[in-house]
């Protein structure tokens, strides 16, 4: 084989190797591009999924905040309604408390009422001796009905008339324009007393508060569900 033939054969082999190498390189390039595209697609999809999840999370948070805000507004509205209802009820109680002033100012009516309150208190305690406390301005009226009250009690329960000692310490005076009507629990018997009596056993272990204010509290609290139903069409919880 001549040198020319050898050279020609070598060139053919080189071209073949080069062509094969280029084909392999193209295959690798195509394969790499496909893998890159797949990875890129996966990354894009993963990022899309992440964005969707973030959006859904934020959307849920917004919904939760809306529900919380709505609940807070609803509760605030309910509190305002309840406060307005309480204001109406308290105004009724204040009006009733003011009416007691007229009762204590009518000495003839109030004198009879004081006697009834004393008898009722004696029946409740059923003690042979008691201590009575009243307002200073009621002292003369109380003293004027003590004997008849003791006799009426003794006749009712068939016992001897009890010994009643009028306490030197008096209940607070009647309310004036300087006092509110609903702060009467701030002191022992309140800063004011609309009238009535407080009777205790001699040892002080049994105390029956039979003041007009205490009677109003008992009656009002007892009737409060009916009052609320009448005013607002519902029974208080």
From Swiss-Prot:
UniProt cross-references to InterPro entries, sorted A to Z: ATPase_E_C, ATPase_V1_Esu
Entry's Gene Ontology molecular function annotations: proton-transporting ATPase activity, rotational mechanism
Pfam families linked: vATP-synt_E
Alphabetized UniProt keyword annotations: Hydrogen ion transport, Ion transport, Transport
Keyword match Metal-binding: no
Entry's Gene Ontology cellular component terms: proton-transporting two-sector ATPase complex, catalytic domain
Keyword Translocase assigned: no
Subunit structure: V-ATPase is a heteromultimeric enzyme composed of a peripheral catalytic V1 complex (components A to H) attached to an integral membrane V0 proton pore complex (components: a, c, c', c'' and d).
Homology family: Belongs to the V-ATPase E subunit family.
Record function comment: Subunit of the peripheral V1 complex of vacuolar ATPase essential for assembly or catalytic function. V-ATPase is responsible for acidifying a variety of intracellular compartments in eukaryotic cells.
The protein, known as: V-type proton ATPase subunit E
């Amino acid at each position: 084989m001549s040198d020319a033939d050898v050279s020609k054969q070598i060139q053919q082999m080189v071209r073949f190797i080069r062509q094969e190498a280029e084909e392999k390189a193209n295959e690798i390039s195509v394969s790499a591009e496909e893998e890159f595209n797949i990875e890129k697609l996966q990354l894009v999809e993963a990022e899309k999924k992440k964005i969707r999840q973030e959006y859904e999370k934020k959307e849920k948070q917004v919904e939760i905040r809306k529900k919380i805000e709505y609940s807070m507004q609803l509760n605030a509205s309910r509190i305002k309604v309840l406060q307005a209802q309480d204001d109406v009820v308290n105004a009724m109680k204040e009006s009733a408390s003011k009416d007691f002033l007229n009762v204590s100012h009518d000495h003839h009516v109030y004198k009879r009422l004081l006697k009834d309150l004393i008898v009722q208190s004696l029946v409740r305690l059923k003690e042979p001796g008691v201590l009575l406390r009243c307002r200073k301005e009621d002292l003369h009226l109380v003293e004027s009905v003590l004997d008849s009250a003791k006799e009426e009690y003794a006749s009712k329960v068939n016992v001897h008339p009890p010994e009643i000692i009028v306490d030197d310490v008096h209940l607070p005076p009647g309310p004036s324009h300087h006092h509110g009507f609903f702060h009467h629990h701030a002191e022992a018997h309140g800063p004011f007393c609309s009238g009535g009596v407080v009777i205790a056993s001699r040892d002080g272990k049994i105390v029956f508060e039979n003041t007009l204010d205490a009677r109003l509290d008992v009656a009002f609290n007892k009737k409060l569900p009916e009052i609320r139903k009448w005013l607002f069409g519902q029974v208080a919880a």
